Amino acid sequence: MSVLGRQAILQAIEQGAISITPYTPELVGPASVDLTLASTFRVFRKVHQVIEVRENTDYRDLTDKIEVPSGKHILIMPGETVLGITRERLRLGPGLCGWLEGRSRFARLGLMVHISAPFMGPGIDSQQVLEMSNFGPAPLEVYPGIAICQFVFQKLDGNEQYEGHFADQTEESF
């Protein structure tokens, strides 16, 4: 499986094999596309109980959905995790998959933009949920609209499609 470079990404977008909505050409880099942070977040409630890690445990039962007004920020305290979501909806056609990765400029501040599960399978058509955690020593102000992460595209041997639980997640269903 090979990683798509800028020209291959642009060609796949032009041919409809990759769809990014909204699409901002300036966010296409040499081997990835930057994705920006939406203004909707899920903040974990402070609980003093054990959370069972099971297939049917739903993060929505443990979080409150908030909207950050334009020009404002969400504050992520050291050791805290909040859920964010990309503004862009990403669709991958057959034969493509990819990886959601953080950006080193923010990692150096202690911000991890996804805890686990960076792989995105072929056929996804969704906004990407970000498990954002502050591993640094100080609170972090994070602003909606910032290019928070990047998506690296790969060619896939085969034409399989991902049809799992989060295949078509949006800001509304998040």
Feature-to-residue mapping (PLM):
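DUTPase catalytic domain/fold
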Residues: M1-F174
